[in-house]
């Protein structure tokens, strides 16, 4: 085990899960992960985007490795157990082209965003396709590049609508509830947002990719705080992507252009 101490906090690295592979317990360009419900707590769902080539190019139609893997991590590297694989490459219902986000609701139902098909595909916990909803557009309940996805304790769904520069809130059946954001640099506007997470108080954190910050909102979309500013220094961000919140309320941000993870307190103070 590798231990790192930063800002008085201890971070223990245990082991890696997976390897480069187009099937089985390995992954091909993994981009998102979600844990199962309490009844399925040992499992994780991992999205592989495959070779990340441009769709509709004849030599890439198979898009080797695109899929969702349900895996039970072992206690050490190499002991992973593959439960199932599902949602491979394609345009038919139940298939994906550019999967981007994954989330699991309270009943164990799995939701996958597809930023190419502009839809959300829904599966049971074993990967059986149930339905899909969403379509291309700029109106309510329509998408242009859905990416990050979050499900709250009431099973309402928040989807980062990247190229529409907004967050949409919907029911688990896809019925539209609310929208916030819009293209801009103001404190409640977004530019190509990507990741999304929530804390135990219900606040929602969105990585505002091209504004080089993470914004904090109430569950109804009211602005609460902003983390980071453009740059390479401590507490500065370059095109942040993923975001997560731990049980203590600390916010972990994937600082994409700076090739690092930074940690902030819930009020936006830089930690490490």
What role is predicted for each listed range?
Residues 1-272:
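Eukaryotic scaffold repeat domains enriched in small/polar residues
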């Amino acid at each position: 085990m590798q231990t790192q101490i930063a800002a008085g906090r201890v971070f223990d690295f245990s082991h890696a899960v997976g390897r480069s592979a187009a099937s089985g317990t390995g992954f091909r360009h993994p981009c998102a992960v979600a844990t199962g419900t309490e009844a399925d707590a040992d499992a994780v769902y991992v999205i592989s985007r495959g070779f990340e080539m441009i769709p509709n190019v004849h030599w890439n139609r198979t898009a080797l490795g695109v899929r969702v893997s349900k895996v039970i991590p072992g206690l050490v590297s190499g002991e992973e157990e593959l439960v199932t694989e599902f949602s491979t490459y394609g345009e038919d219902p139940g298939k994906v082209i550019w999967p981007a986000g994954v989330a699991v609701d309270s009943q164990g139902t799995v939701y996958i965003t597809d930023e190419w098909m502009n839809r959300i595909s829904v599966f049971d916990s074993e990967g059986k396709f149930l339905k899909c909803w969403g379509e291309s557009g700029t109106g309510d309940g329509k998408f242009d590049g859905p990416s990050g996805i979050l499900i709250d304790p009431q099973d309402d769904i928040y989807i980062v609508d990247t190229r529409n520069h907004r967050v949409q809130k919907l029911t688990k059946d896809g019925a539209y509830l609310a929208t916030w954001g819009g293209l801009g640099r103001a404190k409640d506007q977004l530019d190509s947002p990507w990741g999304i997470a929530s804390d135990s108080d219900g606040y929602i954190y969105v990585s505002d990719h091209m504004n080089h910050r993470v914004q904090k909102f109430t569950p109804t979309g009211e602005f609460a705080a902003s983390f980071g500013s453009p740059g390479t220094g401590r507490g500065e961000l370059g095109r942040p992507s993923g975001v997560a919140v731990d049980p203590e309320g600390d916010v972990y941000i994937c600082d994409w252009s700076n090739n690092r993870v930074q940690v902030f307190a819930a009020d936006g103070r830089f930690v490490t």
